[in-house]
C-alpha cells in the first residue's frame, strides 16, 4: 500500500488536490479492515438500536477528527514518542473495552427478545462516550494518521488542502458509521440477531475482548 502511495508523490507535490483525494481514499480503505471501532458500532446497533448505534458512530468519528487534526499539525507524533502517555492510552482504553466486552457478553447471556421490539434506552452520552473512548484508545488510529500524512502531505502542502483532507476524513467517518448503524439496526437484521442472540453477542464480545487484551498487553510491555 505504501509503495503505491509513493508512486503518486510527484503528482501530489504538483497538485495539492491529489494529496487530499489520496489521503481520504486511504482512510476509506481502512473501513474494510475489521477493528474494535467497527465491532463496537455493530454490537451497539444490534443490541440497542439505530439511535444508539449512530451516537456510538459519531463518538468514533469525533475521535477520528481529533487524531487526524493532531496529525495534520504533527502533534500526534509527540504523543507516540512519549512512551508513558502512549502506554497509558493503551492500558486505559483496553480496560474500558474489556469492561464493555464483559458487560455485553454477560448481559446477553440470557434471552432478551424484548430488546428487539424496544431498544435499550440510555442517555445519549453513554453511547457517544463509548464510541469516542474506543477510537481514542486505539493506537492504530494514531499510527495510521502519522504514517499517511507523512507520505501524502508535506511542508509545502497549503493550509486549505490540509483542512480539506481533514474535513473529508471526518465526513467519510460519519457517513460510514451512520451506514453501519442503519444497516445493523434494520428490523430484519435485528430479528436474525435475536434468533442467535446469545452466540452472536458472545462472539462479538469475545472479538472486542481480544482487541482489549492486546491493547493492555502492548501498553504494559512497551513502557
UniProtKB/Swiss-Prot annotation:
One Pfam family recorded for the sequence: LysE
InterPro entries in alphabetical order: Homoserine/Threonine_efflux, LeuE-type
Alphabetical UniProt keywords: Cell membrane, Membrane, Transmembrane, Transmembrane helix
GO molecular function: amino acid transmembrane transporter activity
Sequence intervals crossing the membrane: 22-42, 59-79, 85-105, 164-184
GO cellular component entries: plasma membrane
Disulphide bond pairs: none
Superkingdom of origin organism: Bacteria
Subcellular location: Cell membrane
GO biological process: amino acid transport
Membrane topology: Multi-pass membrane protein
Family: Belongs to the Rht family.
Name under which the protein is recorded: Uncharacterized membrane protein YahN
Organism expressing this protein natively: Escherichia coli (strain K12)
Gene: yahN
